[in-house]
Every structure is written in C-alpha cells, then in structure tokens.
Amino acid sequence: MPQLEFAWWIVNFSLIWASVLIVISLLLNSFPPNSAGQSSSSLTLNKTTTNWQWL
C-alpha cells in the first residue's frame, strides 16, 4: 500500500474545503433577503372563496 503524500493531502483538503465554502456562500447569497414590510410578490390572491382564481 503506497504511503500518503502529506503535501498533496493538504493541497486537496484545502481545495475541497475552499470549494465547499464558496458554493455555500454563493447559494446563501443567491436568495434575495425578505424584508418584513414587503411581500415577495406583487400578486395577491383572495383566499376567502373556494373558487379557483385562474391567472
């Protein structure tokens, strides 16, 4: 069984963790923040009736 080369292990370890952190930060920043005063869409539906509102 070949010996593990420590330098390549450190390089791969740091590259993988840097990639994971970049992907997580991109995913978290891709969603717009929801402010309390604004609704996420300008479309409002009347939910007091049982009829479907086709858009």
UniProtKB/Swiss-Prot annotation:
InterPro entries: ATP8_metazoa (IPR001421). One of its GO terms (molecular function) is proton transmembrane transporter activity. Residues 34-55 are annotated as: Disordered. The chain crosses the membrane at residues 8-28. It is found in: Mitochondrion membrane. Keywords: ATP synthesis, CF(0), Hydrogen ion transport, Ion transport, Membrane, Mitochondrion, Transmembrane, Transmembrane helix, Transport. The keyword Transmembrane applies. One of its GO terms (cellular component) is mitochondrial membrane. It is a single-pass membrane protein. Residues 39-55 have a biased composition (Low complexity). The keyword Ion transport applies. It comes from the Eukaryota. One of its GO terms (biological process) is proton motive force-driven ATP synthesis. It holds the Pfam family ATP-synt_8. Signal peptide: none annotated. Mitochondrial membrane ATP synthase (F(1)F(0) ATP synthase or Complex V) produces ATP from ADP in the presence of a proton gradient across the membrane which is generated by electron transport complexes of the respiratory chain. F-type ATPases consist of two structural domains, F(1) - containing the extramembraneous catalytic core and F(0) - containing the membrane proton channel, linked together by a central stalk and a peripheral stalk. During catalysis, ATP synthesis in the catalytic domain of F(1) is coupled via a rotary mechanism of the central stalk subunits to proton translocation. Belongs to the ATPase protein 8 family. F-type ATPases have 2 components, CF(1) - the catalytic core - and CF(0) - the membrane proton channel. This is ATP synthase protein 8.
